[in-house]
Amino acid sequence: MLAHDLVARPTQDLDLFTPVASEVDPLVAALAEALRGQGARVEVDRRGPGFSRLTVETVDGHQVAVEIAHDARLRASVQLDFGRLLHPDEVAADKTLALFGRAAARDLVDVAALTDRYPLQQLCALAEEKDSGFNASVLADAMSAAAEHPNDAFAELGLSEEATSRLRSKVQEWRAALLTANTENPTRPSPAATRRPPPLAPPPPTRPRRPEHDLPPTRHGREGPSLSL
């Protein structure tokens, strides 16, 4: 999102995606080798099917988390001066699904920023296009749960108390709009949706981060790795 100027907030991680699951492990090995060749310390913290998380410490002591994952592709990636990036529509879908799935404070901040470019209903349409298990009512509950994180969680993301208060007010508006739209245009919940109950409370601060891409992919792209910032 930072690379597309979709949001301005502190971040300490880098996400890399490929539409080919078998490419994840070779990409992890190649990246780790290249970084170590530059003097960085690299540790693989987590590894699973189609996903790895690395902690990288540069020679000057800067630390960053890097996640490499398999993810379905809705749109062709775009080329910028420094490399290929996920299409903005793809980023919008992923961030909406991240809020839908884990209700983290940063997800709410990201989706709020996206509404400057994408109407809420378009975000929902993109999310449903990528994951047929998406449900607007569940997203409404996830927004409410994310808004319940303490002010400190939003302060870490660069929001003042006043900005956090405005965001929580917007959440009430968005929740009402989502529930109204879902009532007027009801859809049958898919099995995937029923596996994701509405968040009842925000996760505790010590809860390990769930990767944004851990939602089940429903489509398969043909392009190579792209990154999301």
What are the residue ranges of the model-derived segments?
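Non-Sec secretion/translocation targeting segments of pathogen effectors
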Residues: 191-229
